[in-house]
Amino acid sequence: MAKGLDVGTMNILSASQDGSETVFVQQRNSFVEIDYSDMAEQMLSRSDVLHIRKDDKVYVVGDDALNFANIFGKETRRPMQHGILSSEESSAIPMIKLIIEQVVGSPSRPNERLFYSSPADPIDSDLSTLYHDKTLESMLGDMGYDPEPINEGMAVIYSELADNNFTGLGVSFGAGMTNICLAYYAVPVMQFSIARGGDWIDQQTAQATGTAVDKVTSIKEDDFQLDFRTDVGGVEGALSIYYENLLDYVIENIEREVDEEDIEEGLDVPVVVTGGTSSPEGFEELFEHHLEDSTIPFSVNEVRSIDRPLYSVARGSLVAARSEEESDGGASDPEPEAEAAPESN
């Protein structure tokens, strides 16, 4: 057995194999603080709402946090910011530990192999991912796993480009960061991140429209489409504007990095876009349109999107973990054959 874990700013997901099916478990990576009362804690426990009590406060954690925040008019708090553990949140480590324990569960055997997603250092910020990676490694090791980080962009390659010999450009549009990896036969040629993602879109939209950030997030995740037929001045119109701006920014940085890395011009590769921020209908077409106007020196033969972009990094992490387990003497097939419906704990 082996597992994959996507530790994202907005969502944490695990992937494991059950026969021919890949099973996903998901929780939102957030929490909200409410006042403690005996009655409130009893109701939360009876309703299976994930929570912990500390002194005179109760912290609702995971998927239910956003619902409670909207009901009580509060903002959710995040253990992570810009793709890594938040230095501004004192409760970051205990909260993310609780969520990870719920999502990944206990190992099926001692030192079970687990690959967890790791962002690349951003090229447009002085943020370092080292503390984040080592903290997660220690946390997962204490849980009984044998953890190994995998670059988030490379996980996309493992997940989506097996049919192209793991060759192509993977772009993971997350909440805190956008991760990019160009791989050739499963060997990374270029990998980096950009310190902008879905959170940046939400924050800019909230500021422009005077709407609470959590409300903007809810609208974006509900039925928002990138069709540009929304009323000017509304939240959806602002979301469309900042989505376009993010794509311009990402592609400009890809062009710059390709030039600096002196990537061979004769390459002809597919591009895969994944991540929760790429979920709105119309995203693939918009990205492809912006890519056509770029000066990237290699050829792009297609732009691929997938039906469930949120699960790509977790799935790729699982593929890598199972492949390494097999090379170490296991008998597992590194390619999951089917996907089960995601679970939420």
UniProtKB/Swiss-Prot annotation:
Task: List the effects observed when the gene is inactivated.
Answer: Essential, cannot be deleted. Low volactin protein abundance delays rod-to-disk shape transition.
List the keywords (alphabetical). Cell shape, Cytoplasm
Sequence segments annotated as region (Disordered): 318-345
Q: Where in the cell is it found?
A: Cytoplasm
Q: Cytoplasm: is it a keyword of this entry?
A: yes
Please classify the protein's predominant subcellular localization into one broad category: cytoplasm
Where composition is biased (Acidic residues), the residues are 334-345
Provide one Gene Ontology cellular component: cytoplasm
Against InterPro entries, the record matches this protein to: ATPase_NBD
Task: Output the superkingdom of the source species.
Answer: Archaea
Quaternary state and partners of this protein?
Assembles into dynamic filaments. Filaments assemble and disassemble independent of the division site.
User: What is the annotated role of this protein in its UniProt record?
Assistant: Actin homolog which is part of a cytoskeletal system involved in disk-shape formation. Could be an early molecular marker for the onset of transition from rods to disks. Volactin is highly abundant in disks.
| Name of the protein in question | Volactin
Species of the source:
Haloferax volcanii (strain ATCC 29605 / DSM 3757 / JCM 8879 / NBRC 14742 / NCIMB 2012 / VKM B-1768 / DS2)
Native organism taxonomy: Archaea, Methanobacteriati, Methanobacteriota, Stenosarchaea group, Halobacteria
